[in-house]
Amino acid sequence: MQGSDIGFAPIKIDSGDDIYVISGVSGQLLKVDKNLKPLADICTPFPALITSSTILGNIWIGVWIERDLRQARMAALDLTDDWSNGPTKSDLRDYQSGFSLHPSSNVWSQILDSEPTALSQVDESICFSTINRGIYKIDGESNEIWRAEIPKWSEIEKINTFDEIVAFLSYEEQLVLMSKAGGFAIIDENGNLVQKGVLKLPEVITGFQYEKDLGWFIKLNGKCFATLSSLTDSPKIYKVLGPVYDVKNIQGEWFWTGWRHDGKLTKEGKLITESRENIGIGIVGGNVLTNDGIWEKIRV
């Protein structure tokens, strides 16, 4: 499937066990398998930008935001179902019906009055944040498990208005969250704050990953990324050609794709990069999906 065109401009790939969901700039969705074979036709369940999404077991959960029409939804779609096209933007513009419309093929859907960010799969649940409201943990059926206040960090309080949580992940039977400005917190299973701190970084955090044997990989919004063995360590900064958009642990080494380059960090700590003429959006196996919707082999 290398060199094939998926048919739209992608913005993200969500990874499941044996299935991947590609989302597009206009709300398109496409399911593919590990061999990059499409499992169904492209569909647009809701006519809005998908701002956050993840996979939990056999469901894909997404957040759709249409800011001009002030419409927002969070919904779950069963990965084993056939998905279909939903309402159009003209349907949403009809004020009388707009607020009753939901993404098609959903197993549950909610109308939102605030924008969730950092939608993340954490063990058998979903965590997300809402700006200036709190952090939440829900199950796969949208039942609330707990909610808590967003941690505050005195070191970065001057920019608190512009800060937001970027992601959550499972870490040693607890969960870790990070904010754009470098704040991190460890939360226990009941939503209680265990530890917090601030990472000193040269750029804004856009995402992060953790692997027991590799430590932490911190994605930044400029021409750097960072690694740490422990959250209490000083970050090690690496310079690259542009932002990293997706990173994977492949055979015990960090591999990534991003703005105009692919890269890897070897077991010995050697940084290797190869330039590309386009932008890498996501990785499946040894393949990169570019911003123009083409599958290519990773270049490192």
PLM region spans:
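Asp-box/WD-like beta-propeller blade repeats and closely related beta-sheet repeat scaffolds
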Residues: G86-P116
